[in-house]
Amino acid sequence: MNFGLFFLNFPENTSSETVLDNMINTVSLVDKDYKNFTTALVNHHFSKNGIVGAPMTAASFLLGLTERLHIGSLNQITTHHPVRIAEEASLLDQMSDSRFILGLSDCVNFEMDFFKRQRDSQQLQFEACYDIINEAITTNYCANNDFYNFPRISINPHCLSKENMKQYILASSVSVEWAAKKALPLTYRWSDTLEDKEILYKRYLEVAKHNIDVSNVEHQFPLLVNLNHDRDVAHQEATAYVSYIAEVYPHLNQQQKIAELISQHAIGTDNDYYSTLNALERTGSKNVLLSFESMKNHDDVVKVINMNEKIQKNLPSS
């Protein structure tokens, strides 16, 4: 089991500059001093809240900043041209000595509508994008398909890692079986309930029973963390931070959804952290991605990072 960082980059009652500075400082800290942290992922949505509009650009900066960590980005590929994503991924793979992780996810309805994509073929568009990207990465070439019309071309620079480039798919009800057929690891949605994550994992395993080798697949579990000796303070900070959830779940009771998230993430005291980590086994996760962004006190963040070294030996090793 390894630890990683996960950045939503939502500027809750603070400036974008401060949010990005906190991300940079946290990544620099764990890259230098905490060997049990192996990855850092940057999330992206075209929304009123997210401030990383170009996740691969952010990843390239963090790759240049660090020496050891693997850096990844979750890219909404349906609203971008797959050849451009393949080019950028191949370039980052070469320049980072294969430390780049390619994370892929689909769009919410707002993104599909804004960029004039058809909702009724959304998953088919996603799969078509992925096929082009993966072909370009693994063979250095790609060609058109049902949704894209261009001649067979060479992607430059060529990807050095090819099929060994780490790839992750954001878990969803429409993508999980498709991901399992390709033995692609999942990054679970932080906003899904543990029960939903567990259902997706079981669906993944059910598909994998049909002669698909997933023995080396390492799913990732994102966990919002806010620990404080005063549980009420942790709850207040985390509640304020995730209040944007109304954008993602406008049809739900917002107070109820926020309370649900607080209960299922590591929000509260140290004991809440230990109990939440038990969820990893239920979802087949081998990596846990921690988001400290709701915590106001940097010293408290460092304390939690130090906790991870002490508890790592108690986590599943396979």
UniProtKB/Swiss-Prot annotation:
Primary gene name: luxB
A Pfam cross-reference name: Bac_luciferase
Top-level taxon of the source organism: Bacteria
Catalytic activity: a long-chain fatty aldehyde + FMNH2 + O2 = a long-chain fatty acid + hnu + FMN + H2O + 2 H(+)
Gene3D superfamilies in UniProt: Luciferase-like domain
GO terms for cellular component: cytosol
InterPro entries: Alkanal_monooxygenase, Bact_Lucif_Oxidored, Bacterial_luciferase_CS, Luciferase-like_dom, Luciferase-like_sf, Luciferase_bac/NFP
Oxidoreductase recorded as keyword: yes
Assembly description: Heterodimer of an alpha and a beta chain.
GO molecular function: alkanal monooxygenase (FMN-linked) activity
E.C. code: 1.14.14.3
The protein, known as: Alkanal monooxygenase beta chain
GO biological process, one term: bioluminescence
Function: Light-emitting reaction in luminous bacteria. The specific role of the beta subunit is unknown, but it is absolutely required for bioluminescence activity.
The entry's keywords: Flavoprotein, FMN, Luminescence, Monooxygenase, Oxidoreductase, Photoprotein
Protein family per UniProt: Belongs to the bacterial luciferase oxidoreductase family.
